[in-house]
C-alpha cells in the first residue's frame, strides 16, 4: 500500500486495550502503514491473536504485554518494558475501558463507580502522562513530535441514563487531553480525543444482540449505519 503522508514506518505506537474492538481498529491503521505497535491488554490469548493480525497487516514490529491499566505500578513497568524493546514511543492511544452496565444511577454501587474510573479515567490519565514524559524527553534531546489520543464517546455531548460512570470518565479524559494539548504543543506533541458513536464490538454481546443493535439504531444515524472497528483504521494512521 502506498503510505504517502500517513507513512508510520519507524514510529512506535502504544494502544491500550488494543487486542480487540476499537483498540484493534486503531492498531490496524498503524500496522497497515508499516508502523511498530505495542499492545497493552490483560488477555494473553487475545493479545497473541491480535499480534498475528497486525503482523499480517504489515506492521513493522508488534509486541504485546499483559498490563492492567488500573494499576499505576503496571503502567510504569509496562513503559519500562516497551522502552527496552523499542527504544522510543511516538504515539499513545489510551483506549482501555468497558461498556456501561447500569440503566439507573441508583443501581450503580459506589465501588463499581470507582472501579470503572480506575481504568477509564485514572488509568488513561497515567498512561498518557507517562507516554508524554518519554516524548518530552526525546523532544528536549532534539527530536520533537508525538501524538496523544484518548478514546472518548458521544456521551461527551449527550446524557444517558445510568451511564454516569462511563460519561464521567470520557468527559474527564477529554479535559485532560485539552490541557495536554496546551502544555505539550511547544514540543510538537499533539493531543486529541476521538469521540465514537455506536460501534459494534465484542463488548456488545453475541451476534444476535449486535445485529439487533445495528438494525435498530443504524438507520437513525446520518449515514444510515452503526460503526465498526475497521472504521478506525484511518484514524489510527
Task: Identify the meaning behind each predicted range.
Residues 153:
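Residue(s) in the substrate-gating loop at a strand-loop-helix junction
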Residues 193, 215-237:
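C-terminal helical subdomain
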Residues 133, 182-186:
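Alpha-helical segment proximal to the catalytic Tyr-Lys
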Residues 103-105, 112-117, 213, 217:
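Substrate-binding pocket helix/loop in short-chain dehydrogenase/reductase
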Residues 128, 169, 177:
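Active-site helix of classical SDR
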Residues 19-21:
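Conserved glycine-rich cofactor-binding loop
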Residues 108, 158-167, 179:
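Active-site loop-to-helix junction immediately N-terminal to the catalytic Tyr of the SDR YXXXK motif
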